[in-house]
Amino acid sequence: MTVTLATFMEVLDSSIANVSLPHIAGGLGATQDEATWVLTAYLVANAVILPAGAYMTTFIGRKKFYMICVALFGISSAMCGLAPTLPILVFCRVLQGVGGGGLAPSEQAILADTFPPEKRGQAFAMYGLAVVCAPAIGPTLGGYITDNFDWRWIFYLNVPICLISLFLTSRIVEDPPYVKKQVAKTQREGIKLDFLGFGLLALTFGSLEFVLDKGQEDDWFGSHVIAFFVTACIVAFVAMIWWELKELREGKRPILNLTLFKRPQFAISFTLMFVLGFALYGTTILIPQFVQTLLGYTAELAGLVLSPAGLMMMCMMPVVGFLSGKVEPRKLIGFGFLNLTLSLLWMANLNLQLSYGQLVFMRIFQASGLAFLFIPINTIAYIGVKQTENNDVSGLTNLARNIGGSSGTAFMATMLTRRTVAHESSAVRNLTPANPGYRAWMHSLEGAFKGGNGTAPPVAGAIAGHGGGGGASFGATHAAQAYIYNMLHRQAATLAYVDIIRYLTIFCAAMIPLLFFLPKPPKNAAASAGH
């Protein structure tokens, strides 16, 4: 609980500001597009620091590094709340992302070292609660605070939690002996920072996060800026791999421990964690957007669609933590992905007549599958790993989840726009005067709008009678056309959501065969994990 507090706060902060962007833009005199940099700046800084955290602990120690990150996160949160202009707020969010990027991997490594292997699943259950539930709670909490108080309080909220976390960490957490030996060795031999490796890492993941966050908004490769950052990401990634392998061959300490990917368990767990982040963050954004834009739900009610699923995960995580010590991780992961696939198949029945209860049960079913994934995926990531590599494992698995979440969000935004346009284009071909059904429908709607008998739908009703010199007939025609287009757009958008969910279903189902490539862990695998 001591270290989970700060991680919950950090993951919460990655989504809590989403619903407050219009208020932030208005309060600081910025446009909506400019305000999105509040999100982008945080994500980019966070992605850069995540894999570098393990490297930094060898210089100053894990406890000290963790406390510095908590302190930086708390101070920068207060600065965000006090920011008088958007550029200052964006700068403070960069600092906040730097502080937040070191929290999750440090906590995971602390848990792996603190708890014996047979109790590690239960420890990861608490950590999983923070990581899995926070994205679902964030938008609801952010909306409530913004509506009832002020957007600045979404940042001030972090300060007391940081203070509590710092106090508890200083009293309870200690570095294990091997970390102290690493720090002593580093200080004795002198600090030799891998500056080039860190620069290439920052350019790779910073560019990737920027592209994922801004790609759809700027029309992907239709934008020279996006094309430039994609090129920079690819070139930097190739150069980073070459440089880090060169550092390994020369016996130096590279910033990324790429030798972990030689182990099938870790390589597959990295892939599975990416998909978990993709599905978790993607659907967490998908459902509220669907109910708000197409079903007319308020932000608060949209949040209540997600909340029961969060409660389900809170109940299931301790159960899965207990089972992880009794059941082979492959079986738990297989059950989780099968459950997730079936829940997405059910969710592919989205339509405009769904009730609140149906939506809630869809999410609860999905949450029950997600709960069976996080803990066992982390468990297999640590199998066969040396204790001195715990920091590297935690940094890379958290990076996989974050990049997966960003990719899922970008995928949803892109496919929603493109599939909606595709379905609209397909449907509009039949809406021509040559179609008898269309003519009859238009005639019926025009009569209803023109007659004002109360039978016409209210959509676009304000248009009727305001068509200019053409009189009421002209206005009724425009009102009828507006009503038909509104219906067409709603149906096209609904079909686009269904398409996205079907793609997600295929994506998740494709992970099940990967489990057959996992070597069966020996009976003492749990005991050897992290040692």
Give, region by region, the residue ranges found by the protein language model.
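Transmembrane-helix signature of multi-pass solute transporters
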Residues: 72-82, 99, 161-168, 235-239, ...
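Structural signature of transmembrane alpha-helices in multi-pass secondary transporters
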Residues: 10, 39-42, 46, 73, ...
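Small-residue-rich alpha-helical segments with characteristic i,i+4
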Residues: 124, 133-139, 143, 283, ...
